[in-house]
């Protein structure tokens, strides 16, 4: 089985540690799938700067293929964070750099490449929405991370993504159970075949239009063991999707309740393990430079 991460890559800069880590939603899913024993590749755009080379080399070192990626003139995306009591705190970013500004367009050759994978994953940070309809004629399953921001919950945005997605992930730790279930129902009504909501310590909920399945979070016995929560949602999605694939999920075979239940448990276990990992998948190096001046701070943005 083969999993493709299509879209975003970014450097996660932890200012409290002075360390840069490779990351990005699409990258992380590919790396985690590889660590779970599947073949994996990443398809996207790297900047032609030192950080872009750092990302490409770090991803390849995980056994994830990057040979079909593009390298373009421009800066690499940088996200600035710190850790407070094990939780990541997002401070700002530079807009994603050339990866977001000039996203990859799927031509016939790349579509043939994508068709060789069982699952292709993308996200709101990938600027891949316009490419999703091109995947409709393939037997490749499509998963998409809808994140947590309200701008990605509007009817117009959901209608761009959901009809083309076999699985969507929603981060819902800020919502109660009723609001989470209502959101899951909406994305399925708008075309997603299966919707997964992760709710942090409150576990996760999956809905396919027929059945609703829930699972508790896998708790860390000693919170002091938690290194940071970077990549935990991506890890949950990957563990969930890999379990579905191994259970027979395909473009022509939707998962039944018992398989969804098992996949939720696998997702929770994978997310638990991710809490004990530094950054998204390690591979950190000293930053050597401060956060760039163009980055906004969340507290200022909300004013």
Where are these regions (language model features)?
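Short, acidic/turn-prone active-site loops that include or flank metal/cofactor-
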Residues: 24-27, 95-98, 146-151, 173-175, ...
């Amino acid at each position: 089985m083969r999993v493709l991460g299509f879209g975003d890559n970014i450097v996660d800069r932890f200012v409290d540690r002075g360390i840069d880590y490779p990351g990005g939603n699409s990258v992380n899913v590919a790396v985690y799938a590889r660590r779970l024993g599947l073949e994996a590749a990443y398809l996207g755009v790297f900047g032609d700067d030192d950080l872009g080379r750092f990302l490409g080399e770090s991803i390849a070192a995980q056994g994830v293929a990057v040979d079909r990626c593009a390298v373009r003139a421009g800066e690499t995306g940088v996200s600035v964070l710190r850790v407070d009591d094990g939780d990541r705190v997002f401070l700002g970013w530079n807009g994603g750099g050339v990866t977001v500004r000039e996203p990859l367009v799927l031509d016939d050759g790349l579509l043939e490449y994508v068709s060789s994978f069982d699952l292709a994953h993308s996200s709101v940070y990938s600027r891949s929405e316009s490419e999703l309809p091109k995947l409709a004629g393939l037997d490749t399953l499509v998963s998409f991370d809808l994140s947590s921001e309200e701008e990605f919950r509007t009817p117009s945005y959901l209608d761009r993504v959901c009809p083309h997605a076999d699985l969507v992930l929603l981060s819902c730790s800020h919502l109660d159970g009723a609001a989470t279930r209502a959101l899951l129902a909406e994305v399925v009504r708008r075309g997603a075949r299966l919707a997964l909501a992760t709710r942090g310590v409150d576990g996760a909920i999956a809905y396919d239009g027929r059945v609703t399945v829930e699972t508790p979070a896998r708790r860390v016995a000693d919170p002091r063991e938690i290194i940071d929560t970077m990549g935990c949602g991506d890890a949950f999605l990957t563990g969930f999707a890999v379990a579905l694939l191994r259970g027979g999920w395909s473009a022509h075979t939707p998962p039944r309740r018992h398989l969804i239940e098992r996949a939720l448990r696998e997702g929770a276990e994978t997310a638990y393990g991710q809490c004990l990992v530094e950054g998204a998948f390690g591979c950190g190096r000293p930053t050597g430079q401060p956060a760039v001046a163009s980055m906004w701070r969340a507290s200022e943005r909300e004013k």
